[in-house]
Each structure stands twice: as C-alpha cells, then as structure tokens.
C-alpha cells in the first residue's frame, strides 16, 4: 500500500508531480528574470506580482474553483462585492497602478474587470475624448466617478439595429432653444440602446451616442451625458431600462437595454471638445470628426494586453498537463514490461506543434501589447495638448499619428483576440476529456473570452477598416506618387516588389526562415503584393469586393507589428543570457503563427519559394519545437501567474494533476448524498410496472379468452 498526498492507493499510481519537478530542475534559464522581458522591466514585473499578491490575499477578490459553480445571480452579486472592494484600492492607487490591477483582474475574473472598465474606461474615456477639460473635471473628478464613487457610468453606443455602423445609430438629441435643452428620444425599437454594460442595475449615467438635430437638420452622431437614475437609484422620468438576460459568458455583467422617451438634459450635458451648440442653436462642427472616436482606442489596446495574459494562462495549463499526463508506451519500449512508463504527452511531436505556437504567441504578443499601450498614451496626450493650445500644426501631426495608431490598434485587437480564442479551445482539446471540465478553466475562459472578438469593433469589420486605408495608401502611392509615413511606411517600396519585380522571392531556404528580420521583410512584401492585387479590383469595383484580402492584410499587419517590436525588445534586453531562448521563441512564432498559417499567401505571391515552405513543415517547425521542449516549464513559469490566477485543477504549479483535480471535485461535490433531488423520477422510470400491468392486463390472452365468449 502506498500513500500519496491525500489519497491512499493499493499500488503505485501515476506520479505527474515528479515529472514537473524534474523538468523544472533541468531548465536552463531563470523564469523570474525572463518575466522582466514579458512585463517590460524589472520594476513593472515586481509591481505586477505585488498587485497579484494583494488580490490573492484579499478575502473578497480571491478566486478559486468554486467560481465555476456560481449561478448567474451569484455571479452578479459577487461581481458587485468585488467592485465595491476594488473601489477602496482605487482611492489609493494612481490611474496607472489601478489599470495594472485591472489587467490582472481581467484574467482572474474578467467580468469584474469589464464591469469596472465600462465606467472607468469607456464612460470616462468618452468624456475625455469628446468633452472639454472642464467637462471632464466635472464628470470624472468633481462627481467622484474616477474613484468609483458618486456616480457610475455606462457607454451607450450600440443599438439593437446598429452596432459596427456607429454613424448609423438612430437615437436622437433634438435641441430645444426655448428651454436650452436637448430632448433625447428612442424613435423606434431599432434605436433601443442594447448590450449596454451596467445599464440593467448599476449605472447612474450614460454617455449616449445620438444624432444631433437642430432646427430640423441632422448634424450626425454626437455624444451626450444622460442621467439614468437619481440619488435613490430610481430611474429618471422617461428612462426605461431592462436586463438583456442570459449570455454566452460574463454573466456577472448587468448588460441591459435603454429606451429614452422625451428625456430632457441641459445643453451643457453635450460633450463639446469638438462640436459645440450655442444657446441660439448655432452649431460649430469639428473640422476633424474622426477624433471623437478616440475613446474606443484605449479599450482595443487593453484587449491586446488581455490577449497576452490569456495566451499565457491557457498555454500554461495545457503544457503543465502535457508534462504530467502519460498516454501509450512508445514503439521503442517493451509493451509487456509493467515497469515501462507511458510517453508524456509533451513528447509527442504533434502535441508540440499544437501547443508550442501559443506559448510563443504569448511572448511575442506581450511586447506588442506594451508598445501599443505606450504609444496610445503618448499620442492621446500630445493630441489633447494640441487641441487645448489650438496648435494647428501639432493637431495635424497628431492626426497622422492617430491614423497610424488606428491601423495598429485595430489590426492588433482583431488578430490577437482571435488568436487567444483559438488558443483556449485548442489547449482545451489538447487536455482531452479533462479539458472539458469547468474546474480546469477552459470552459469559462472561452465563454468569457470570445466576446472580445465582437465588442469595441467586430473583428471582421475592424479588419476591413484596417485593410481599407492600406489599400487607399497603395493606390495613392501608385497613382499619385504620394508618400506614406508611420507604421505602413514600407508600402512606399511597392514598385520594388510589383510589376517586373513581382517574382522577387524573399524567403528561399531554411537559412532565410531562421532570420526573423527576413521574415519581417517577407511580411511587408506579402502585404504590398496582396494590397497591390486587391487595389486592381478596387479600382474597377469597390473596396467591398476585396473583403477577404483586406482581412488577410490586417492580420499580416498585426504580425508585422508584433514581430518588429519583439525583435527590438530582444535587442534592447539587458539580460543577454536569455536572448538565445527568446530568439528561439521568436523563430517558432514566425514559423508557425505566421509562415505556416499564411503559406498560401506567401506561395501565391512568390514571397517564399516552394522549397522554403516544404522545409518549414518538414524540418524547421519540428526543429524549433525540439529546441523549446527542454525549457517548456521555465517558459511557462516565466509568466509568473500564481495558482489563483491560473485557477485550474490540472494547471497548478506543483503539477500534481490527478490529486488536485480529484480533490477539487470531491470538495465541491461531496460524495455523501448520492441521491439527487430528482431521484423519485429516476426510480419511477426504473421501477415502473410492466406495460401489461399498467394496462391492467386488459390485452392479455386470458382477457381475450374471456371477452370472446
């Protein structure tokens, strides 16, 4: 008889714990130092771990396996309790520190992060992006919103009949000169505000996107702050709200619908950084309307960071399980030897090819996420200063930067959230039947995650909006000799890779595949040639005829950005002993996530030779997987995500997958009362009398003999 951690066995059982301990002991680099790379610096790494520790030790914010058994109502209540608790941290945190705290909560309990983010992110960003400095000070600071106090905002853009086409929303804001008020109306069911996070129960105010109507003239969609509830939390007159009910995930968010019936607000509740309406009804339109949508960019950038953390989490779970799980004895082992161990899942080449790309993606996405986060902060700060000082030159410079940021943030949001969604399900499948258990984290992760592919820009629509300006830039260069600046400046080389140069191959052999800078160049050429071909159709028809190509261009642009920033960050990283391990990860990403997935594009447009693509599949990817394999545990440990953050029975640090999983199942489902509340129905089914007895034997031969006389 043997004794394991908590359970008694009559013979030696599986020992996954020893497997992961052995792997960890044989790792060739320090995960703590590697985390400095992933988080951008030692200081940020230590801050993130400190914030995670606070969450883990907080009795309200702490999350464990019981989280997966909560009902919708329980999730709603617990979410509010957590927001209440986080509001206390917000009072002592800087904005930057609290955003980092929310970034961790986005993995631990995403519905909490979202429900707060609607208020502090979307609502206040809308006011900051569209309101004057005085308006922002009033709504954010004076009213206490920035501290989650006083009032709670929601973001009223989406309608039942309009989502992606924001310019088409139909809620109206009609100016009444006599009272100096706007009258907010929902003219029909299609204009009902829909999917509004916080509207059902929480929000006191809403930043409403509505059509400005003055003297019967429609001036397009502007933004207005509209009170929904009074200080007693009762609905304001003319405001009707409802809960939209059960969703695929994130049930802790009180998404609702809103209808306005002649709701009057003061004229100065209209956000007036760009568009102004005087008391006499004079409308001063913004010279650059697109600036008013800057509020959406912050959310998109945060989703890139969310994608990194989700990729890190699910790849860690699947890889730790793959180390502990053994299945089938190898061909070189005596199948009849009872002492011969089965093969670890992690050692199957197919399993490596399935999972290692997502591990690599987490590393590469982390650098891009940090870069675009820094870029949006600096760009918006420069823009705000330019507008405040009425500096026309600086405004137009900021506009160029904003256009580039729109392309980068849009392509990154769409591509990385798609990638994370794919990773969650592939990692789940790689864990077999156990991956289907809610207690192992994938089910709720997927259901909570996939909305990221839809909100704040549906990924396909967003990808189209990224691809369109790139096509227009190509046409401008080719037809009008224009020069492009910013992150798409490489498009200026279009003549070098089209026309008589259309057959110029960038990736010829394995050596080229190993050179990340050449891979980056190949992505540029692929975008140029794809955009050049799409532009031919666009000139004849319209951009809509190039939809599939536009989405491909957007994805390639995202990978170009991510790999470029990864290479820069590796070159700047002070811990040179880690560079070889990072280079391996970067090459694996470029080989699997980029070249393998887009092999058709690279072959079709002569960017890579057929031999290079053949070598990629037969030699390069298996070789890179073999290089990553000895340090898989160190690579995952480098994410520095605790067991509380991971929240998966099979993904814990100690690797004891069976003990941990079995213990959690017994803890949350005590095997004491084995009869269910519906046992009577089961017993009635199993113990029911025979059909003849239930028919009182009225159709029996005996009855027939009696009745036939």
From Swiss-Prot:
It is found in: Peroxisome. GO terms for biological process: fatty acid beta-oxidation using acyl-CoA oxidase; lipid homeostasis. The keyword Oxidoreductase applies. It catalyses: a 2,3-saturated acyl-CoA + O2 = a (2E)-enoyl-CoA + H2O2. Pathway: Lipid metabolism; peroxisomal fatty acid beta-oxidation. Its cofactor is FAD. Residues 1-25 are annotated as: Disordered. The keyword tRNA processing does not apply. It holds the Pfam family ACOX_C_alpha1. GO terms for molecular function: acyl-CoA oxidase activity; FAD binding; fatty acid binding. Keywords: FAD, Fatty acid metabolism, Flavoprotein, Lipid metabolism, Oxidoreductase, Peroxisome. It comes from the Eukaryota. It is an enzyme of class 1 (oxidoreductase). Residues 1-24 have a biased composition (Polar residues). GO terms for cellular component: peroxisome. SUPFAM superfamilies: Acyl-CoA dehydrogenase C-terminal domain-like, Acyl-CoA dehydrogenase NM domain-like. Its EC number is 1.3.3.6. Belongs to the acyl-CoA oxidase family. This is Acyl-coenzyme A oxidase 4. It comes from Candida maltosa.
């Amino acid at each position: 008889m043997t004794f394991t951690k908590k359970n008694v066995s009559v013979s030696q059982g599986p020992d996954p714990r020893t497997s992961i301990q052995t792997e960890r002991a044989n790792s060739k680099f320090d995960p703590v130092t590697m985390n400095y790379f992933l988080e951008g610096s030692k200081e940020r790494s230590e801050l993130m771990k400190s914030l995670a520790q606070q969450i883990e030790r907080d009795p309200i914010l702490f999350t464990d396996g019981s989280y997966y058994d909560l009902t919708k109502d329980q999730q709603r209540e617990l979410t509010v309790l957590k927001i209440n608790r986080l509001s206390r941290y917000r009072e002592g945190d800087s904005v930057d520190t609290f955003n980092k705290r929310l970034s961790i909560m986005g993995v631990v309990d995403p519905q909490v992060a979202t429900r707060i983010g609607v208020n502090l992110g979307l609502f206040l960003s809308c006011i900051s992006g569209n309101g004057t400095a005085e308006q922002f000070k009033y709504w954010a600071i004076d009213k206490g919103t920035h501290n989650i106090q006083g009032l709670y905002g929601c973001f009223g853009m989406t309608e039942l009949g309009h989502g992606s086409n924001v310019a088409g929303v139909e809620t109206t804001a009609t100016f009444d000169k006599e009272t100096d008020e706007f009258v907010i109306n929902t003219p029909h069911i299609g204009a009902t505000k829909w999917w509004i996070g916080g509207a059902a129960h929480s929000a006191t105010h809403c930043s409403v996107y509505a059509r400005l109507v003055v003297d019967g003239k429609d001036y397009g969609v502007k933004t207005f702050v509209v009170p929904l509830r009074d200080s007693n939390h009762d609905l304001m007159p003319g405001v009707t709200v409802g809960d939209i009910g059960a969703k695929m995930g994130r049930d802790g968010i009180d998404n609702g619908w809103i209808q306005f019936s002649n709701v009057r607000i003061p004229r100065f509740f209209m956000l007036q950084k760009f568009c102004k309406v005087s008391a006499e009804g004079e409308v001063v339109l913004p010279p650059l309307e697109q600036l008013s949508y800057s509020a959406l960019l912050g959310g998109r950038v945060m989703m890139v960071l969310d994608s990194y953390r989700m990729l890190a989490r699910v790849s860690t779970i699947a890889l730790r399980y793959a180390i502990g799980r053994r299945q089938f004895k190898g061909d070189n082992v005596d199948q009849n030897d009872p002492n011969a161990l089965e093969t670890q899942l992690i050692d199957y080449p197919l399993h490596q090819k399935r999972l290692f790309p997502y591990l690599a993606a987490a590393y590469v996405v982390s650098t891009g996420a940090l870069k675009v986060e820094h870029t949006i902060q600096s760009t918006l700060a420069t823009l705000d200063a330019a507008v405040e000082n009425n500096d026309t030159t600086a405004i137009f410079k900021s506009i160029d930067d904003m256009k580039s940021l729109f392309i980068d943030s849009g392509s990154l949001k769409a591509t990385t959230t798609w990638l994370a969604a794919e990773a969650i399900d592939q990692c789940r499948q790689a864990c077999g039947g156990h991956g289907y258990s809610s207690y192992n984290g994938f089910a709720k992760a997927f259901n909570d995650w996939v909305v990221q592919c839809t909100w704040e820009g549906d990924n396909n629509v967003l990808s189209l909006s990224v691809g369109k300006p790139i096509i227009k830039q190509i046409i401008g260069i080719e037809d009008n000799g224009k020069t492009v600046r910013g992150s798409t400046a490489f498009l200026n080389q279009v003549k070098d890779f089209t026309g008589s140069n259309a057959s110029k191959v960038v990736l010829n052999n394995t050596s080229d595949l190993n050179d990340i800078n050449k891979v980056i160049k190949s992505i540029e050429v692929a975008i140029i040639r794809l955009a050049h071909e799409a532009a031919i159709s666009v000139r004849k028809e319209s951009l809509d005829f190039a939809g599939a190509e536009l989405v491909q261009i957007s994805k390639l642009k995202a990978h170009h950005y991510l790999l470029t920033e990864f290479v820069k960050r590796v070159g700047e990283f002070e811990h040179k002993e880690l560079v070889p391990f990072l280079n391996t990860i970067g090459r694996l990403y470029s080989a699997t996530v980029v070249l393998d997935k887009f092999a058709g594009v690279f072959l079709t447009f002569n960017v890579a030779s057929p031999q290079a693509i053949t070598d990629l599949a037969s030699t390069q990817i298996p070789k890179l997987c073999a290089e990553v394999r000895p340090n898989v545990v160190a690579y995952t440990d480098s994410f520095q995500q605790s067991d509380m953050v991971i929240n998966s029975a099979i993904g814990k640090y100690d690797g004891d997958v069976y003990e941990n999983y079995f213990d959690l199942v017994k803890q949350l489902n005590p095997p004491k009362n084995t009869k269910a509340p519906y046992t009577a129905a089961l017993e009635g089914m199993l113990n029911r009398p025979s059909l003849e007895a239930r028919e009182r034997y009225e159709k029996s031969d005996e009855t027939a003999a009696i009745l036939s006389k």
